[in-house]
Each structure stands twice: as C-alpha cells, then as structure tokens.
C-alpha cells in the first residue's frame, strides 16, 4: 500500500500505524539503563509490598560457589528462578527469593592456592583464609552483576553468604542441635579420601570417570593345609597390606577346585567357569564346602605375618570375581561393616597423602597407586599370584582435583542416617514431596535408601570449624551443648576467625573441665565442616519457619543435586523439624553443546552467556532462549539455535510494534464498553482469553517452553496472519472515531496489555518497554495476570471457527491466481464459496463480515457471471476466485458497487475524507 500511496492524493487520510517504538531492539545497549531504573525504583521490593498479606510463595535459592563467572548453565538456572518469581508475583502471590552464595570449601581454597602458585607453600593458614574470603567476596560481586545483567530481580541488601558471621553461627548452632539430639558422632570409619587434597570427601563430592586398574587373582593359603588356598580377586592390590579377612555369602555354594598343578582353590561354584575363562587355569571340582566349614577356616596373609579370618556378608555376589572377597575394614564400606560385626578394628596403614606408614614397613613412604606393581611382583615372587591383567572400570574421583580417590579409615565426624528411624522417616517424607520430573522421586529414594552415614568433617583450612576440643591430659574429646552454644554466640559476633585467633580456654565457657579426668587444659580440633553441610542448613539460616509445613515452596536446581543439596538439606530438616525443607523439587538437565558434549573452555565449545549472547543479542534473547527449552532434560545448544530464537524475538517485537502503531491516538480510557464491540473483535478477545488461560496454567506448571510455542503461534498466526490482516482495512481506512475502528482499537488495546503482562516474566525488558510506550506510568511488574474468563464466548468461537475452516482454502485459491499472474492484491478478487454439505456461510455470518475475514472485495454463494481466475477445493469446500467488474477505490483498494467511475472513492471513503 505504501508505495502506491506515495503517489496517491488520499494517502494522508489513511491511518497508517505510527509509533516511536523502535523496530530495532538494540537490547545489548538499552537494557542496562532499564536495569538501573528497576533498581532505583525498587520495583522488586514494590512487587512484594503490593502483595503483602497474599498467599506466600518462597523459592529457596541453592547457593552457587563464589568461584568464577556464571556459565550458561548458571544463566539457565537463575533465569528460570526469576521467571518463576515474577510469574508467581503477577499471579497474585507474595513471591520471594533471596539469592545466596556458597563461600567456604575446596572449590575456593583450591583456586586460591592455584592462584598463589609457588607462594602457596609460604602462605600460612591465617593468610590463606583471608585470601579465600576476599576471593569469595570478589566473585559474589561479579556473579551479582551477572544476575542483574540477566534481568533478574533481587535486592542487593537481601542476600545470603555462607561466610557471613550470622550464617556461620547458624551452621554451628544447627550442628550443635544435631549433636545434642544424638545425630552426630565421632568414629573411625573408611571414607572417600583425596590423597591430592588430603581431605575426606562426601558422596556429593564424587564424580565417576573411566579408570584402568590392575585385576589380580590371589591365593590365600589355608592355615594348617598343604597346597590348599582360597582364591580372591581384587582391583586394588594396594589394599592387600590392610587385609584382615575373606568374606563369603552363606547363600552361595562354594567348593574346592583342583588346578593342573595339583593345588586346590576355594571359590564359588557359580564363578568357576568365569575364572577359567579369564585366567586360562583349568578347574576341576573336588568337593563342596559348607558355610559352617568355611567359618572355621583361617588364612595366612600372602606377605604379612598375620592371619586373616572368615567373614560373611550379603554384599558378596556372583557378579564378578570368585565369590571370595578380600576384606580390608579400613578401606571399604562393606568391609568395615562385616569387620565391625566380627569385632575387627579398621586398619589402614596409609597416611593423609596416600603414602604407606610404618605399619607397612616394606613399602613405607611409597604412594599407594605407585605401589601396585611392587605388590603384584611380591605376590608373584611368593607364588601366590594366579593371574594378572588390566581392568577398565568406572572409578570415583575428586570433584575438584579430578584425581582418583581411595577409601581410607580415619577419625571423622559423622551424621547418623539411621538414628531415631531417620532414614525411614525421610523416605516417607520424600513420598509427600512433589518431584518434577516425576522420575526424581525414584532417583532420590534409591540414594537415600543406600547412603552411608554422612562424613561431616574435612581436613582443610577454609570452612566452619567443628567446635570440638581435646583434653591435653587424657586425650578425651570434649564437646557438649553448653560449649557449642557459647562458641555460637562468639561466631555470631565475630565470625569463624575467632576460632583461630583465640586460645582454646577463651573459646570454652569459664570453668569447663574434662568429663573424664577433670583437667581444664584443652587444645582445639583441626576439622572443619563439609561445605555441603553449610548449604544444607541454609533453610534454617535464611528461611522463616512455618507451622507444620516446609519453609520453602520450591527448590530448583540441576538434576545432579539429588545426590547433593536436595539431600544435604533434607537430613538436618528431617532430624530437627521432622519435615523436609521443600514442598516441590524441580530440576533441570545439563547444558551441552549442539553435539551433546559437555561445554568446556579446553574443548572450545562453550557459550559464554555474557560475551556470546547478551553483548550480541541482549538478555531478553537469552531469557527467551531459556523459555524455549524443556529444561527437565539435558539441553543441547549452539550459536545457531540462539540465532533462531533471536529471529522469533523479532516477530514478537514486530507484533508489539504493530499493536502500538495502530493504537496511536487511542488510550485505554477510549475503549468501548464490552457490549458495543463488533463480533469479530469479540471473537479474537475470546481467543485471547483462552491464550491467557493456557499461558497462566503453563507458568503454574513451570512449562515455559509451552508458553514460548504458544506465544510464537499467537503472534505470528492468530494475530499477524489472521486478525491483523482482517482488520487492516478497518484500522487504516475507517474514520478514527468510527464505532468499527474503535471496536478493533479497543480489542488491540486489551491484546497489547494482556500480551505485555503475560510475557513480562520472560521478556522483562521488552514488556516494560512496551508498557511504557503504551503510556503507562507504573511498572508492568506491578500488575496482575488478567482474568479474562468473561471474554470467553464458546458460541461465538464455534460460529467463527466454522467459517474460518474455509479461509485456508480461500488463501490457496488466491495464491494460485497470484502465481499465474492473474491477481495482485486479494482485494482485487471476489469469491464464489460452495460448501459441499450445503451450508450457507452467509446464514452464519453477514456477507460483509465474510469479506473482512477473507480480505476480499466480494463474496458470492454463486458466481454472477464473473471471470474465474483460479479454483481450489478440499473435501468440505470449493472456492473460485472471481474478477470483479466494479472499479477499485483509490483510497482503500476495495472494489465496491457504489463507485461510479475510475478515480472515484467508495461511499465509506467519501464519508471519511469529506
């Protein structure tokens, strides 16, 4: 229209869209100013103040490590949380989330030591802790900037840091309450141990990677017998110095098997064939041996001067090996349990750095993994090695050093999983939590069912000290409720540094004496708490208590947190509250590259949310991308997918721009009453009502990808392709104050406002920009989701939908005419529409309305003798495109019967132009 109208004397009378709303978003440059406006206007605080007294919704933020900048996975996590809080607020809830940061622990300490380089050896513990605190503080600031740049709402004076004195005091306090209630004990048990970092690891700090281990079959001589042995299989030869027994299963059948050399070996009947296949040693069964007979056997250790005993345990299976399990209670959980039942002390001749101690003098000072070849050679020299090969398997590694871990028995502090029926109570509570996706309950149940006691202590510098003391006179450990409460108060006032700056006597209540010997001389312990305990007590430190229900409505983190934060939060809450800390747990998958590989700097396949997305496209594009994902599964992303999302954003923006342009000169105050609106506009308001209802339901169900799909479809098809096309003539060519134009403008106003509010949680900048461009004074975030149920009109929808079935047939018929160069604009056409079931469309809708719906000049039930330009049909309708004989109106381009000659205006346009 525009090119023709440049030469058209009536072009100035046509009400073309007019708006200052820019076509080019320029998000990267313009968003920062809006961020500052939100902050200075305290919009997030006002959102909550406006909804005080409403139903509360609390999303508890799982604290990321204050270590490095946010990566793409972080951006997904934080943006989804922000979408949830904003959508809940717009839905009328008092919605709140306090962002937090995990500030203690190995991730930060290791990075600081790495930054120090050679100076690390010269750096004392006090200076190291100071550097760790400064490092964490620096990245809390940087990540906070990222959070704002993601267009997330948060209050900078309402955050939590696990290294703040108040939080540290709460950690000590909760530890004390757990101790007081019998859930915490000190014991010597095998735990995952990092020989690189010289500290214990919890289950949540373990990652499994492929690892090649030696696979050996070893003969243990039976005491008092000649040429009779028990055959064991192990992939950890270095643990053999700690062997105290061989474990069998009473449900498995065992026998003596003779080899070609005449030796007899005890092994499980069900594994004899497998052993022969692996070792190449022929085995012939000699006789069976019962469990009672096995129980009295004793075995000579292969190279230590001691006896190994028979043990029994259900963990022994026929999955691999010989059915006779080498047992070192100091180097394995199952080994420890069966050893404990038999009265064996856990024995581990290995120090903190993985070197043998003087309890194994033959290899004292040698690292355990380095000792494997020498132990194998020792067995070979003694004639006790039946077979040796290499074995690749999944093996536990440290999450920080990425190096293999060992099991090692050391004195540690533990949380009792089975005290006071806690495990059973927790499993029951898990069933009452909503897990999204639903498979989350199976995953966490399986972990909770089998998890060993939680090792709470660590042997590092940067963390909250366990307030335990040792009597210098008798060596008794001293810790009680009074001393913990005393220390908690000190930490609340001065932070954990007081543990290191003050003497033991000053950290204990006056008059404290050893409960065993009465001495008043103590020394401080060296253990700190597991960093997972820090974040695990965050529901106590951050959230308010609710009567008989969890303090948080929602936890949302990556699916790896089923073994991490979801559990570390669950145990203290169940122990002290008797209920879980969360009502609902929602998880997301990993963010991978487009080939399904993990993103990493070394592979060069990473996408930086700031440099690669925000600085190029803007944060609204990043947020729209997040909303497009079904984040419950792992997510593949490449730069091409971001480009596609940016193109979809452009379509949404153009929809907003078209709405604003057509509302030039029309305000909400000029809206017509509902009962005065045209049927076509009422029909599309009814469709808007259904769209809004669906979107709000999708927000409620955290199905943001469904919103993305519906939004694109609504903007590009329902509005741009259909409704805007239908009302273009009315909006451009009817008189500004005509009832028909005002009816459509009223509908457009409602559509614009509704779209603005519905998209605000996702497209936060754009929605606010549109809201202001529409003349609104307050923020879009201070509105509520509209309740448009009264616009829902089923009868009207059925009437229009029955007619719109033919629109697709009409458009195909028109396209055929265009392709054959018989037609330009659709307004140059008339139509003959025949329903094959005899339905008369003009009985459903007036002829004038049909012309608007199909954007043509005339609609006929039967061709009045006009030339046929094209034809198309389907099983329901046939359509002929006709060439009107009437002259075209030079202003609106319609061919109407009230035009007498070329160049004259139609009656409608005459009345408008005057």
From Swiss-Prot:
Q: Residue ranges for motif 'KMSKS' region?
A: 598-602
Q: Which GO terms describe its molecular function?
A: aminoacyl-tRNA deacylase activity; ATP binding; isoleucine-tRNA ligase activity; tRNA binding; zinc ion binding
Q: Which residues bind Zn(2+)?
A: 889, 892, 906, 909
Q: Where in the cell is it found?
A: Cytoplasm
| Locus of motif 'HIGH' region | 64-74
Q: What does this protein do?
A: Catalyzes the attachment of isoleucine to tRNA(Ile). As IleRS can inadvertently accommodate and process structurally similar amino acids such as valine, to avoid such errors it has two additional distinct tRNA(Ile)-dependent editing activities. One activity is designated as 'pretransfer' editing and involves the hydrolysis of activated Val-AMP. The other activity is designated 'posttransfer' editing and involves deacylation of mischarged Val-tRNA(Ile).
Domain annotation text? IleRS has two distinct active sites: one for aminoacylation and one for editing. The misactivated valine is translocated from the active site to the editing site, which sterically excludes the correctly activated isoleucine. The single editing site contains two valyl binding pockets, one specific for each substrate (Val-AMP or Val-tRNA(Ile)).
- Subunit structure comment from the entry: Monomer.
Question: What protein does this entry describe?
Answer: Isoleucine--tRNA ligase
Tell me which species this is from. Answer: Leptospira interrogans serogroup Icterohaemorrhagiae serovar Lai (strain 56601)
């Amino acid at each position: 229209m525009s090119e023709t109208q440049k030469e058209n004397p009536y072009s100035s009378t046509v009400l073309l869209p007019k708006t200052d709303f820019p076509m080019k978003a320029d998000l990267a440059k313009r968003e920062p100013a809006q961020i500052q406006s939100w902050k200075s206007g305290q919009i997030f605080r006002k959102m909550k103040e406006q909804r005080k007294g409403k139903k509360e919704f609390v999303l508890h933020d799982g604290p990321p490590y204050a270590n490095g900048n946010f990566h793409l996975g972080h951006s997904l996590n934080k943006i989804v949380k922000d979408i949830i809080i904003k959508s809940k607020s717009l839905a009328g809830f008092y919605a709140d989330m306090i962002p937090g940061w995990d500030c203690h622990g190995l991730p930060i300490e290791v990075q600081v030591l790495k930054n120090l380089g050679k100076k690390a050896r010269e750096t004392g513990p006090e200076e190291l802790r100071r550097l760790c605190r400064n490092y964490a503080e620096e990245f809390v600031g940087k990540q906070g900037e990222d959070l704002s740049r993601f267009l997330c709402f948060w209050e900078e004076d309402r955050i939590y840091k696990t290294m703040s004195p108040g939080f540290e005091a709460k950690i000590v306090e909760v530890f004390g309450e757990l101790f007081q209630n019998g859930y915490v004990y000190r014991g010597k048990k095998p735990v995952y141990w990092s020989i690189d970092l010289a500290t214990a690891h919890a289950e949540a700090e373990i990652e499994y990677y492929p690892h090649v281990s030696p696979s050996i079959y070893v003969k243990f001589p039976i005491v008092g017998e000649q040429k009779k042995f028990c055959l064991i299989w192990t992939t950890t030869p270095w643990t053999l110095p700690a062997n105290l027994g061989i474990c069998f299963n009473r449900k498995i059948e065992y026998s003596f098997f003779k080899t070609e050399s005449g030796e007899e070996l005890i092994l499980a009947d069900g594994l004899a064939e497998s052993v022969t296949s692996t070792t190449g040693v022929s085995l012939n069964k000699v006789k069976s041996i019962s469990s009672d007979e096995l129980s009295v056997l004793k075995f000579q250790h292969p190279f230590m001067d001691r006896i190994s005993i028979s043990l029994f345990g259900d963990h022994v299976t026929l999955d691999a090996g010989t059915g006779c399990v080498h047992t070192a209670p100091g180097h394995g959980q199952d080994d420890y349990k069966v050893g404990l039942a038999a009265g064996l002390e856990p024995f581990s001749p290995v120090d903190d750095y993985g070197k043998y101690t003087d309890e194994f003098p033959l290899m004292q000072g040698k690292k355990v993994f380095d000792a494997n070849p020498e132990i194998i050679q020792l067995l070979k020299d003694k004639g006790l090695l039946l077979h040796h090969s290499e074995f690749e398997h999944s093996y536990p590694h440290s999450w920080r050093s990425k190096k293999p871990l060992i099991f090692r028995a050391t004195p540690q502090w533990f949380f009792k999983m089975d005290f006071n029926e806690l495990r059973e109570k927790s499993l029951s509570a898990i069933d009452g939590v909503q897990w999204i996706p639903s498979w989350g309950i199976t995953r966490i149940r399986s972990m909770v069912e089998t998890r060993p006691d939680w090792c709470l202590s660590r042997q590092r510098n940067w963390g909250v000290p366990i307030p335990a003391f040792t009597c210098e006179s008798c060596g008794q450990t001293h810790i009680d409720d009074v001393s913990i409460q005393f220390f908690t108060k000190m930490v609340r006032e001065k932070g954990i540094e007081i543990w290191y700056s003050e003497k033991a006597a000053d950290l204990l209540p006056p008059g404290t004496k050893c409960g065993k010997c009465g001495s008043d001389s103590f020394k401080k312990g060296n253990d700190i708490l597991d960093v997972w305990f820090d974040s695990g007590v965050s529901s106590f430190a951050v959230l308010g208590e609710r009567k008989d229900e969890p303090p948080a409505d929602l936890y949302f983190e990556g699916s790896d947190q089923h073994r991490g934060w979801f559990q570390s939060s669950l145990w203290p809450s169940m122990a002290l509250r008797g209920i879980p800390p969360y009502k609902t747990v929602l998880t997301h998958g990993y963010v991978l590259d487009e080939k399904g590989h993990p993103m990493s700097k070394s592979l060069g396949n990473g996408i930086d949310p700031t440099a690669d997305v925000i600085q190029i496209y803007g944060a609204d594009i990043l947020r729209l991308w997040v909303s497009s994902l079904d984040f419950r599964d792992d997510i593949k992303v490449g730069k091409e997918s971001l480009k596609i999302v940016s193109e979809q954003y452009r379509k949404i923006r153009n929809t907003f721009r078209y709405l604003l342009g057509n509302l030039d000169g029309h305000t909400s105050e000029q809206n017509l009453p509902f009962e005065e609106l045209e049927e076509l506009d009422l029909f599309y308001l009814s469709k808007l009502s259904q769209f809004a209802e669906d979107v709000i339901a999708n927000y409620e169900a955290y199905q943001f990808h469904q919103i993305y799909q519906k939004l694109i479809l609504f903007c590009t098809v329902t509005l741009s392709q259909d409704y805007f096309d239908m009302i273009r003539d009315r909006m451009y060519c009817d008189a500004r104050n005509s009832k028909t134009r005002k009816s459509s403008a009223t509908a457009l106003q409602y559509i614009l406002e509704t779209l603005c509010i519905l998209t605000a949680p996702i497209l936060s900048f754009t929605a606010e920009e549109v809201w202001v461009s529409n003349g609104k004074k307050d923020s879009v975030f201070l509105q509520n989701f509209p309740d448009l149920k009264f616009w829902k009109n089923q009868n009207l929808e059925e009437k229009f939908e029955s007619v719109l079935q033919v629109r697709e047939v009409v458009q195909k018929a028109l396209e055929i005419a265009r392709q054959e160069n018989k037609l330009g604009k659709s307004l140059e056409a008339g139509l003959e529409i025949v329903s094959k079931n005899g339905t008369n469309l003009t009985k459903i809708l007036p002829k004038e309305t049909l012309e608007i719906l199909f954007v043509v000049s005339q609609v006929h039930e039967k061709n009045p003798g006009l030339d046929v330009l094209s034809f198309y049909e389907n099983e329901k309708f046939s359509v002929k495109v006709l060439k009107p004989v009437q002259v075209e109106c030079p202003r609106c381009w319609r061919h109407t019967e009230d035009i007498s000659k070329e160049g004259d205006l139609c009656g409608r346009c005459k009345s408008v132009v005057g």
